[in-house]
């Protein structure tokens, strides 16, 4: 079948000549330098930061010579999440997570910047002079080499200014990235196929009177090519009401509605044409005079003259730079009904910007052609409008969607806009970049905020990446996960200790496997004995601290020198009662400085025959060294003023011992509400020691709390825990909206972080079930992500009593197979007709 329409090859019409020294050279002798652009993430930029970004663009563009073109091109492509279910060693829950997000659609953003040097003649040409309209293109020769050299130098300055801004990163594209190479398409090929995949293929381009097609895709173009289409006032950003409150502000760039907020395949092209500023103003002066002389024939001429005068007055009085500008949104679809919907969506988003939506059907081919990377000088001059540089820059999209961390270690969280899974490193990468100085975390989330779900989700992924995890809990939050790990590892991991009267948790704080007592070990013993001896509100005297320190040091010297003495609390008590008493007598230490009888009397319950003699004299050492997932459940003693703090300290001390022996392996201790047991003045130094030691031995200390009052009323929490936790994690705080000022001050949060926290769960997608979480790293990097999990993970993590009862009852029916019970229960919820048995 013959094609009866006029046809030509892309080769005949192709406007580009070559790529030399990383620059695209057009057949009309225009030079273009191409960059890949990294923008800040969505919802993470404040008004002041948007103004700083605007200022950086302004300074950078000012260094470019006359008759340069700045073309920013933002591709937004709908893609589907591809799960990594074939990965070796993937656990049951990880596989469930990946399957849950299988083919989840999301909008991916690719941003490019093209800086072009053209000539005065080319910059004035209209659409009928486009290379698309010429029968044959004869390559032109670059006659002025010095102009090219100066332009390349200016581009280098432009790049430095933008990269030094701290917000936007430019990376110059290489020749293979522009033209492509074996198996990888370049940006030009990708543009012609409306794709960003490396394996894209070229498609036929159809130019018809009523539409333009690329392959099966129909193009839909909206333009901002007249100053009448713009609102009366432009700004760098606007308030995003969906995520703002009367106490917080969420900001987006002015053009964000046609960026990541427009959920269809589209390209947003932003052009700024830098002509000769002085000549522009001179031409306007001449036009104003002409309008004045013709004003008697039409009032419109007088009005236009006044507008031009105002433009000139602004330019001269404020030193503003006169430029031309054009923006367009080019969307596409292979479905005509879809194109109608897209046309309405684009029009609505432009209306949100208070712009007049102008659906352009006439200039689609020439504007598409001018959008080819390197062919910016082919832009039809009649499609641009005069404005000032500052106003033109307000039409730039200044944010992108969330990105994954470039790190082998991390946790999977979901993008709060699209729900796409992201790999987020909140431990190692921030330390490498100098954003944080430790890996410790402080988690604050009220009851019902999804705190337990998040911590379960986090520690599971840490465990699966080789970390040793020790949890101190007071609410059975980790029972399901621990049991699942226990069954899967045949009892090697997932060890669950519960404190009962029949089987209490007992330790020996004086036992050291290698016989070496370092400073941290001595400090933990002193803190433990101080906790037994003094009440929380009773501070020891300096003389008492010295006496206790000397007693511990002397006892350690005894047991390391005399192997016949069994290290335990009983022998320590006897040593103080007999040997140390004689030492004090020889030194003439007075009773008011250290009351040894009072000391022994208070500690007697922990000595042989006392009420708690089992607690510190264990002859069985818990094997915490080789078990990678351990939970201590202290719910039964959380209200016991003696047992709770002592048991918590001993667990922490045992964790420190574990850390010393496991070199080069990540260790994590997570303390839920049990931190309250150690938040006393006497323990402040010990907690600081713990945090210092954790950092030294590749560890992470994580404290979790739900009561705001607890952290507000405790100076120990601020000084010892919060100040030593560079990662702050907060969940929904809306119930504490009226108290948030004190929380903000306590945690040292910025106003930007406050706005992000108060936006949590404000505009959740109705079709997805998730809770949002805020992360702050070192007070300089922060974002909100979503904890969205599969049904299998949901039933493993749930703390809802009825759901836990249902799950464990089903597991009992299945012979204790919790994994199978989770699978059956999840499947029955997905397909209500199925039975769990």
Question: What is each PLM-predicted segment?
Answer:
Residues 85-90, 127-132, 374-377, 485-489, ...:
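Short secondary-structure boundary/capping segments
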């Amino acid at each position: 079948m013959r094609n009866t329409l006029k046809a030509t090859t892309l080769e005949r019409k192709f406007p580009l000549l070559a790529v030399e020294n990383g620059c695209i050279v057009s057949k009309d002798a225009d030079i273009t330098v191409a960059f890949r652009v990294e923008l800040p993430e969505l919802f993470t930029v404040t008004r002041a930061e948007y103004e700083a970004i605007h200022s950086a663009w302004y300074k950078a563009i000012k260094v470019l010579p006359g008759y340069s073109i700045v073309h920013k091109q933002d591709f937004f492509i709908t893609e589907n999440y591809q799960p990594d279910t074939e990965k070796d060693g993937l656990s049951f829950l990880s596989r469930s997570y990946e399957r849950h997000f299988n083919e989840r659609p999301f909008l991916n953003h690719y941003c490019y910047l093209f800086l072009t040097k053209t000539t005065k003649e080319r910059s004035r040409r209209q659409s009928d002079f486009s290379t698309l309209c010429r029968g044959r293109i004869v390559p032109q020769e670059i006659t002025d080499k010095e102009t090219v050299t100066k332009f390349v130098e200016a581009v280098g300055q432009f790049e430095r200014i933008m990269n030094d801004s701290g917000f936007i990163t430019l990376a110059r594209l290489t020749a293979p990235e522009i033209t492509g190479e074996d198996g990888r398409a370049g940006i030009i090929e990708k543009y012609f196929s409306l794709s960003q995949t490396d394996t894209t293929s070229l498609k036929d381009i159809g130019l018809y009177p009523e539409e333009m097609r690329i392959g099966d895709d129909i193009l839909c173009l909206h333009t901002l090519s007249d100053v009448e289409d713009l609102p009366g006032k432009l700004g760098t950003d606007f308030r995003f009401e969906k995520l703002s409150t009367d106490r917080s502000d969420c900001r987006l760039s002015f053009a964000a509605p046609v960026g990541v907020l427009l959920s269809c395949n589209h390209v947003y092209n932003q052009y700024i044409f830098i002509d000769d500023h002085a000549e522009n103003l001179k031409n306007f002066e001449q036009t104003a005079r002409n309008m004045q002389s013709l004003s008697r024939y039409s009032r419109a001429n007088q009005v236009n003259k006044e507008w031009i005068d105002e433009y000139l007055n602004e330019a001269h009085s404020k030193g503003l730079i006169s430029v031309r500008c054009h923006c367009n949104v080019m969307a596409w679809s292979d479905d005509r009904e879809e194109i109608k919907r897209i046309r309405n969506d684009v029009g609505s988003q432009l209306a949100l910007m208070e712009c007049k939506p102008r659906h352009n059907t006439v200039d689609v081919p020439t504007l598409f052609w001018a959008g080819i990377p390197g062919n910016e000088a082919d832009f039809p001059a009649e499609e641009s409008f005069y404005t000032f540089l500052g106003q033109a820059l307000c039409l730039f999209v200044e944010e992108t969607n969330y990105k994954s961390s470039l790190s082998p270690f991390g946790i999977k969280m979901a993008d709060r806009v699209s729900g796409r899974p992201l790999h987020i490193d909140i431990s190692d990468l921030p330390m490498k970049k100098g954003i944080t100085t430790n890996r410790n975390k402080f988690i604050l989330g009220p009851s019902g905020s999804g705190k337990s779900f998040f911590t379960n989700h986090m520690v599971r992924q840490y465990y699966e990446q080789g970390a040793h995890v020790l949890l101190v809990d007071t609410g059975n939050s980790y029972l399901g996960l621990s049991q699942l790990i226990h069954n899967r590892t045949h009892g090697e991991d997932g060890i669950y200790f519960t404190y009962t009267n029949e089987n209490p948790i007992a330790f020996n704080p004086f036992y050291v496997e290698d016989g070496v007592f370092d400073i941290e070990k001595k400090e933990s013993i002193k803190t433990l004995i101080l906790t037994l001896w003094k009440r929380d509100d009773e501070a020891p005297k300096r003389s008492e601290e010295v006496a206790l320190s000397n007693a511990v040091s002397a006892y350690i010297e005894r047991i390391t020198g005399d192997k016949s003495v069994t290290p335990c609390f009983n022998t320590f008590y006897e040593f103080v009662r007999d040997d140390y008493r004689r030492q004090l007598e020889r030194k003439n230490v007075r009773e008011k400085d250290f009351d040894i009888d009072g000391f022994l009397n208070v500690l007697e319950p922990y000595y042989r025959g006392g009420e708690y003699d089992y607690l510190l004299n264990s002859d069985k050492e818990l094997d915490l060294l080789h078990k990678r997932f351990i939970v201590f459940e202290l719910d039964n003693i959380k209200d016991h003023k003696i047992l709770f703090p002592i048991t918590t300290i001993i667990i922490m001390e045992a964790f420190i011992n574990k850390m010393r022996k496991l070199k080069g392996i990540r260790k994590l201790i997570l303390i839920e509400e049990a931190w309250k047991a150690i938040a006393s003045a006497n323990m402040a130094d010990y907690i600081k020691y713990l945090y210092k030691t954790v950092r030294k031995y590749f560890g992470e200390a994580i404290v979790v709390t739900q009561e705001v009052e607890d952290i507000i009323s405790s100076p120990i929490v601020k000084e010892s825990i919060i100040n030593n936790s560079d990662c702050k994690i907060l969940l929904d705080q809306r119930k504490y909206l009226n108290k948030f000022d004190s929380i903000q001050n306590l945690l040292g949060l910025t106003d930007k972080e406050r706005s992000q926290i108060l936006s949590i769960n404000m505009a959740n997608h109705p079709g997805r079930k998730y809770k949002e979480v805020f992360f702050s790293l070192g007070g300089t990097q922060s974002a909100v992500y979503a904890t969205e999990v599969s049904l299998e993970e949901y039933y493993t993590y749930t703390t809802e009593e009825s759901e836990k009862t249902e799950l464990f009852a089903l597991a009992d029916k299945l012979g204790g197979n919790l994994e199978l019970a989770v699978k059956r229960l999840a499947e029955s919820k997905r397909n209500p007709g199925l039975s769990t048995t």
